[in-house]
């Protein structure tokens, strides 16, 4: 491809709303153009990267035995009504009506559609298992689309769905998909981790996320410093280590703590380590039937509440902050809430780490008073509704639940997610098969997604510098950029065209920059757009030399012109 004929454009300034590198460079480099909030056109460069990613994914999915399909983007709303997700998904599900006033949705995911495809078609266990996948457009009406392709409203996704007769066979496919995903992300040239995760709105009994490590990631990942333990902070656990309070209290007593509502103030006043205190976090739980209630979550004073864990612990759709007026309306005393003497109507959850804990400081449920020397040895002291759950967020330095080594927290961008769905979708949609005894059973399902367009941005977040993108060669739109210093010099153009022919004949994606531009802007475009290698055919050609540059390392090599091809191949294959 000649740059002079290629629909490519670069710009010096990034959009004002671009705050991450991938968004800035994709727009400046002419890969994408915004059409509306969270919706982008892909220019040729962007489409080439997208196709490279798609090809790697397709090759590995086909090798796993999965079969490609194409499901509808516009889906009847009635399918979503069958599973109850039409209501549960909320405003992110974009609903439309046709001229006959029939309701449809723009699919953000396709569980309902694929179950509808399979039910009545696969009738016997003899036809199982089957794994169907597609690489297709999706739409999620994000309230705040941002970060370019990382959180758009319209996006391209690879979603696969497997159907099984037994849980054991689902486990086999889940493990196969995990290995397939590892192969995909390795071949894409990415540094990633597979981590245990929350199933979220998709549902199911178990899931793993695939995270590209990047400082700009929105997700916190907990990883062990010694073993292979890794989990999203939403589900991460830790080894509980009990410490004995050196400050002993002969009797449980109330302490007057006027206007002291924070853990720090109370513990400093009483003279106790915050580890031996109980923090109350009050939320209003919203349920999918529209009802709500005030819930108190108790964690150690040194811990913070992990909201996804807390949401799952009470089976809520979401948790929102409760106002002081709402707390007072149910008999709570803001700033002085503790597990002893709570109003009987108030629901509460205690973190597992506090189970059987002693010598604690907590709120007395009375204004300006805290309790000193409290213990949770006897749950009956708290009433019959006491529930312990893991609701605290893991912190840096906590002990690994697997080996006991210190845990670290890093940032990641979610690019893949695999789920064990079980019968969450097949049962409500009455999708069944006949087992070996002739009995109707619901399909046991798995679900496996990859954010294809999101991978473009994730790759850049991991591979860039202050000049532009540094593409892994596996997904670069062009691997080599041949820059002609002066296109008016016939000898430069002839040599560049000959090298171009040799590289393309060798299967190397190459672009020939034959624009009648100054040398400076050509080099700037090479660095911005991010091709892995460039060959500069300039003034030194008359001395029999050209320059080869490695975009990743920044190294410059002056080589004999007859060695240019060999040097380029050496860098590419390194």
Swiss-Prot record:
Q: Which top-level group of life is the source organism from?
A: Bacteria
BP terms from Gene Ontology? prolyl-tRNA aminoacylation
One Gene Ontology term, aspect cellular component: cytosol
Q: Is Nucleus there in the keyword field?
A: no
The EC number(s) this enzyme carries? 6.1.1.15
Query: Could you say which enzyme class this protein belongs to?
Result: ligase
Q: Write out the catalysed reaction.
A: tRNA(Pro) + L-proline + ATP = L-prolyl-tRNA(Pro) + AMP + diphosphate
Q: What is a single Pfam family found in this protein's UniProt entry? A: HGTP_anticodon
Keywords on record: Aminoacyl-tRNA synthetase, ATP-binding, Cytoplasm, Ligase, Nucleotide-binding, Protein biosynthesis
**Is Lipid metabolism among this UniProt entry's keywords?**
no
A GO MF annotation of the entry reads:
ATP binding
Localization annotation: Cytoplasm
Task: Quote the PANTHER family the UniProt record gives.
Answer: MITOCHONDRIAL RIBOSOME PROTEIN L39/PROLYL-TRNA LIGASE FAMILY MEMBER, PROLINE--TRNA LIGASE
* UniProt remark on domains: Consists of three domains: the N-terminal catalytic domain, the editing domain and the C-terminal anticodon-binding domain.
Tell me which family the UniProt entry assigns to this protein.
Belongs to the class-II aminoacyl-tRNA synthetase family. ProS type 1 subfamily.
Function in brief: Catalyzes the attachment of proline to tRNA(Pro) in a two-step reaction: proline is first activated by ATP to form Pro-AMP and then transferred to the acceptor end of tRNA(Pro). As ProRS can inadvertently accommodate and process non-cognate amino acids such as alanine and cysteine, to avoid such errors it has two additional distinct editing activities against alanine. One activity is designated as 'pretransfer' editing and involves the tRNA(Pro)-independent hydrolysis of activated Ala-AMP.
Subunit notes for this chain?
Homodimer.
What is this protein's name? Proline--tRNA ligase
Say which species the protein is native to.
Answer: Nautilia profundicola (strain ATCC BAA-1463 / DSM 18972 / AmH)
